[in-house]
Amino acid sequence: MLELSVSRLGFGLVAASPWLLLLVVGASWLLARVLAWTYTFYNNCRLLQCFPQPPKQNWFFAHLYLVPPTEQGLRKSTQLAANYSHGYLIWFGPITPMIVFCHPDMLRSIANASAAVAPKNMDFYKFLKPWLGDGLLLSAGDKWSRHRHLLTPTFHFNILKPYMKIFTKSTDIMHTKWERLITQGHTRLDMFEHLSLLTLDSLQKCVFSFDSNCQELSSCRKPSKYITAILELSELVAKRNRQIFLHADFLYFLTLDGWRFLRACRLVHDFTDAVIQERCRTLPENVDDFLKAKAKTKTLDFIDVLLLTKDEDGKRLSDEDIRAEADTFMFEGHDTTASGLSWILYNLAKHPEYQERCRQEVQELLRDRESKEIEWDNLAQLPFLTMCIKESLRLHPPVTIISRCCTQDIVLPNGWVIPKGVICIIDIFGTHHNQSVWPDPEVYDPFRFDQENIKGRSPLAFIPFSAGPRNCIGQTFAMTEMKVVLALTLLRFRFLPDKEEPRRKRELILRAEGGLWLQVEPLSASPQ
């Protein structure tokens, strides 16, 4: 047997077996890793001393429960933005620091950093991975750059223009349902419920050219399995995010919720795969000519555009990539837009003078026109309605925070240093409610977005669609849908606040506990 003298280690002349040697090497490696981690942690703590931090709950939990995802937590975010107007340090337990930015001057360095320097923090987004795959939301590096480049033309106004008719049709369906409910005596409606189905309805038509009738079916029986699965996945991800001990995959997928999540993922993927395979099966050999000819006679849906897309080398997206992007678009497009629209109607219900002015602007635009449809060129002719939308997105941003992880040290304008590996939170809600950026931030005032008032304001003061190279690629799509739905809805209905004030709730998007309820009246029955 091989024998080694380990006397130099201080053990005297001892016969060492290979197992002992392996143990020594392993212990040395582990010690080196611990020392390296300790040095990095100490160095990070030294660099982070310049950042102010609120008082800790205790040494172990630190700031873990400082900002709960409730109305109280959102008020705490506003208070923290007031106390630490440029940003602050919090500890997620005893050893994990996070820097929260709530001021345009400070978040600029993170928001404008390249995707390689400040990629998304996957600890924050990993729960979506089995559902969305490597779509734009979750991909990184060269794959993200390639997909972003390929998909940007997908949201060109020439592609979006035909979707206006889809938005109009889906809105008309919702209005017909509302009129029926109101005649039955149901004048108190949950905006989130109805607008979520509207956005899912329009998205399925825009993405797949598929009419699920989900809005009509909802009043008498459950929507399609696909729609149910989308809603279930959103709910399960938000629920898991609150359950810290189920963040580990090996634990979560042993639970009933984990099984439900995987089942819903399979259902969503099967639906998307079936659409892609059917579309590919029916495509002729000359795909480009076929799709271009189709575009002249029919609206190209998102799947068509993805099939048509190719890079400089002529390479197309794989079926797996197309599925990931379609699923990502469905996820990002329905909940966020529904949240935005719900809070806009809430704010207009609270401020009837602004609601009436928006209505008059739309009525004036469509005066003496046979068709009461909003056309693409009309969107720029609704300045006050646009101001009201933006102010609502400031006060109630659908996405309240985004998370980044620095791959290198980043020096801020004031000389502070964000150490490599530290998680950074861009607090959209905190920035929008920061009194050093927005005077009287809790007041709903659309005139903040008047052209004169915008001058001199940092573009990073208003970031409902994020900012920088990883901003929301579909923001024009979302704003277009919100303008069309809001304009047509104000032509037919008047909104009044409910007796109970909603309590805001931070999940994947900004919701209201128990729904966002408003009193809805047909315009013809309302006082003039």
Curated annotation (Swiss-Prot):
Membrane topology summary: Single-pass type I membrane protein
Residues annotated as signal peptide: 1-36
GO CC field: endoplasmic reticulum membrane
MF annotations from Gene Ontology: heme binding; iron ion binding; monooxygenase activity; oxidoreductase activity, acting on paired donors, with incorporation or reduction of molecular oxygen
Pfam families assigned: p450
Gene3D superfamilies recorded: Cytochrome P450
Binding residue positions for heme: 332, 472
EC number assigned by the record: 1.14.14.-
Superkingdom of source: Eukaryota
Record field: transmembrane: 87-107
Compartment(s): Endoplasmic reticulum membrane; Microsome membrane
Cofactor(s) needed by this chain: heme
Keyword vocabulary terms for this entry: Endoplasmic reticulum, Heme, Iron, Membrane, Metal-binding, Microsome, Monooxygenase, Oxidoreductase, Signal, Transmembrane, Transmembrane helix
Catalytic activity: prostaglandin E2 + reduced [NADPH--hemoprotein reductase] + O2 = 20-hydroxy prostaglandin E2 + oxidized [NADPH--hemoprotein reductase] + H2O + H(+)
Catalytic class of the enzyme: oxidoreductase
Protein family membership: Belongs to the cytochrome P450 family.
Function: A cytochrome P450 monooxygenase that catalyzes the omega-hydroxylation of prostaglandin E2. Mechanistically, uses molecular oxygen inserting one oxygen atom into a substrate, and reducing the second into a water molecule, with two electrons provided by NADPH via cytochrome P450 reductase (CPR; NADPH-ferrihemoprotein reductase).
The protein's name: Prostaglandin E2 omega-hydroxylase CYP4F21
Native organism: Ovis aries (Sheep)
Name of the encoding gene: CYP4F21
